[in-house]
Design a protein with these regions (language model features):
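Sec-dependent N-terminal signal peptides of Gram-positive bacterial secreted proteins and lipoproteins
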Residues: 2-24
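Low-complexity, Ser/Thr/Pro-rich intrinsically disordered linker/stalk segments at domain junctions
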Residues: 23-148
Length: 148
């Protein structure tokens, strides 16, 4: 009987003194670089450029968690540099906005002077519908390309 009582005592002591470890459920959602840069209305966004003859081609993408009153790109600036360090604005482009849940630019062409490295800076933007709809902005800068 003493052995049974001792075993029960040890079992109860271990049960109440061993710390429990919190468990977090694994997420099935895929992770990507864009996920870490966004929160809220915008679920992903990207920006890159390629070179052409005296022009650059912009490829940009923005996706929202649902349909938005306004989604797209604001404060679009074409910048140039001779050293990839000191950037100057060559031109601005009007905002590109529409309603919906995504907006994709595929080889959006912009003429440039040439003789420099070029890049694009813009703000990915989404605004909800409704009187008190919130908005989200994510600034982004593209890679740079040389244009003769």
């Amino acid at each position: 009987m003493n052995k049974k009582a001792l075993a029960l005592s040890v079992a109860s002591v271990l049960t109440y003194t061993v710390p429990t470890m919190p468990v977090k459920a694994a997420s099935n959602a895929p992770t990507s670089v864009s996920d870490s840069r966004t929160a809220g209305l915008i679920s992903s966004c990207s920006l890159s450029i390629s070179s052409g003859r005296k022009q650059i081609y912009i490829a940009a993408d923005i996706k929202a968690i649902e349909s938005m009153k306004s989604i797209g790109y604001k404060n679009i600036s074409i910048e140039y540099s001779s050293d990839k360090v000191n950037w100057k604005k060559e031109k601005s482009i009007d905002d590109l906005l529409k309603s919906g849940s995504s907006y994709y630019l595929n080889n959006y062409s912009v003429s440039v002077s040439g003789g420099y490295y070029y890049r694009v800076s813009l703000t990915h933007y989404a605004k909800e519908s409704g009187l008190f709809g919130s908005s989200q902005s994510v600034p982004n800068t593209s890679n740079s390309v040389w244009i003769d």
